[in-house]
């Protein structure tokens, strides 16, 4: 019995050392089961939106959309500094810029929201202010179809066939924006107003996150 207990003790010690070794080696970068990587995976499965100020910051640092994805993937999360109470959580991340300098920034995440806001200009969750500016889709999960809706009922020519979801997805990510001032971000299931230029007009639609897509509630042309 003593021999068995001794072996179990050594096994437990070795297992614990192995876990610590893996954790410090990967530092939230390679283990999908770590809390930090679960958060980052949830972020990258949604649409990261940036306003004009954050876009200007990225331009100044010469960081592309692909660079933002890499930045998030390689960042670590400080849960002790993050504000994670309530439906919408604000996480503090530590990353590295292309020039080698460190960057402390913020990301907000709501489980029932398809949109994630990023703030490269602040590092304290208490200082984070939701922008009322126009938000541009910057980083998103690569899939052909991000939208679901009753296309035949909207009455917009060119968006009635089976190709409507893919067509709208392409237009939104290449030319569209989210009108953040009209978004209801405090609800249990946030809804957003999306603007998409199309053939000299602007299509306005509202939608919410459902089964990893944007469920379209309304879709119409913008009135003058």
Predicted region positions:
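Ribonuclease/tRNase effector modules and their secretory precursors
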Residues: 1-56, 60-224
């Amino acid at each position: 019995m003593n021999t068995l207990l001794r072996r179990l003790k050594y096994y437990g010690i070795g297992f614990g050392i192995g876990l610590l070794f893996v954790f410090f080696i990967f530092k939230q970068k390679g283990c999908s089961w770590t809390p930090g990587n679960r958060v980052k995976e949830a972020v990258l499965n949604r649409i990261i939106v940036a306003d004009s100020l954050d876009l200007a910051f990225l331009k100044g640092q010469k960081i592309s959309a692909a660079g933002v994805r890499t930045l998030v993937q390689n960042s670590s999360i400080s849960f002790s500094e993050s504000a994670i109470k309530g439906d919408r959580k604000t996480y503090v991340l530590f990353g590295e810029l292309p020039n080698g300098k460190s960057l402390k920034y913020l990301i907000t995440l709501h489980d029932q929201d398809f949109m994630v806001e990023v703030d490269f200009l602040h590092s304290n969750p208490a200082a984070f202010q939701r922008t009322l500016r126009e938000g541009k889709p910057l980083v998103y999960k690569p899939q052909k179809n991000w939208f679901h809706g009753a296309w035949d009922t909207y009455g917009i020519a060119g968006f009635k066939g089976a190709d409507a979801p893919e067509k709208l997805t392409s237009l939104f990510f290449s030319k569209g924006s989210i009108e953040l001032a009209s978004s209801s971000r405090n609800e249990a299931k946030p809804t957003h107003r999306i603007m998409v230029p199309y053939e000299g007009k602007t299509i306005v639609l509202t939608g919410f996150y459902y089964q990893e897509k944007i469920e379209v509630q309304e879709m119409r042309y913008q009135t003058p």
